Amino acid sequence: GSMPDYVAKYPVIQTDDERERYKAVFQDQFSEYKELSAEVQAVLRKFDELDAVMSRLPHHSESRQEHERISRIHEEFKKKKNDPTFLEKKERCDYLKNKLSHIKQRIQEYDKVMN
């Protein structure tokens, strides 16, 4: 329930220099966010696809091998989705998203005041 660190770290912008600094941080972390986000989305999308495939599989599948193969892939992705490294990436991704929108908001507020 505590405030995220960036709220205190990025208060209302007072000067053009500050605006420049905020903008630099934004651009720097936006590229990290984009990379992470693409990676995280790919895993989640793949997982959803597999979920759909699994649910469409006939339970008394003619080909047991096919069934087992898809089950195995599904398990792999379940592991990957609950993998601490992946969860960390997902958390970092959400954190960056919120941080970036906070910084962007500060920049927009400053621009409004200045114009």
Explain the meaning of each model-derived region.
Residues 42-45, 57:
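Eukaryotic short linear interaction motifs
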Residues 2-31:
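Short, charge-rich amphipathic alpha-helices with coiled-coil/heptad character
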